[in-house]
């Protein structure tokens, strides 16, 4: 655990840098993730200066550098920012993405949840150049931008709602309004926990509510989760395991838990 960012341990030789770094650390802690480019704009300094400041802050355990910016030190957040979690199990997530994208057919309407594994689905879907007339409904702003490259083969509908910067997601208020009026071919929903008894769970309540609405809006309900999520239980329940049509995970998942999930009535497929 680190301490709340402040001036302690910073050289007093450059008062402007002292104040700027303290404020940068505060932004990282308050927002969960801060981009180098955004910090440069806020403080009116170059990206080189921001990177130097973040490196100095990391050396004092005030922040942790990640690609493109910084997050709070490890262990301080129950929920990791998108930019941090995308580097966890990347090969497994990529395999799941290709597997899931292979299920989509021309003419399908697809609901695609926010998250790093669902982002892998979006990237794999872009590469399926033979698909036509596919509509993707998403609450992930980054996913919408990933799919923009495939327009007009793939039409993108953004759900609307209230922005959660930590995951670039849209939630309630107004996050489920559109979903309540849809009937999609399939929904691909991510999560932080898949347990045969508790069901599908997520680390935060606002997104769990949207995830449930996504599943209810689809004829086929698919959970995508790398092996580290299988057997885990988090704060917010999304649904029971028997409400899920299919779980796509990877071979690193605990085989005993996978067998229990299958026995509970949920089909399981291992990608990769």
Task: List where the protein language model places each region.
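HTH-adjacent hinge/linker in prokaryotic transcriptional regulators
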Residues: 2-114, 120-132, 149-153
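Conserved phosphate- and dinucleotide-binding cores of soluble alpha/beta proteins
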Residues: 2-39, 44-47, 59, 141-272
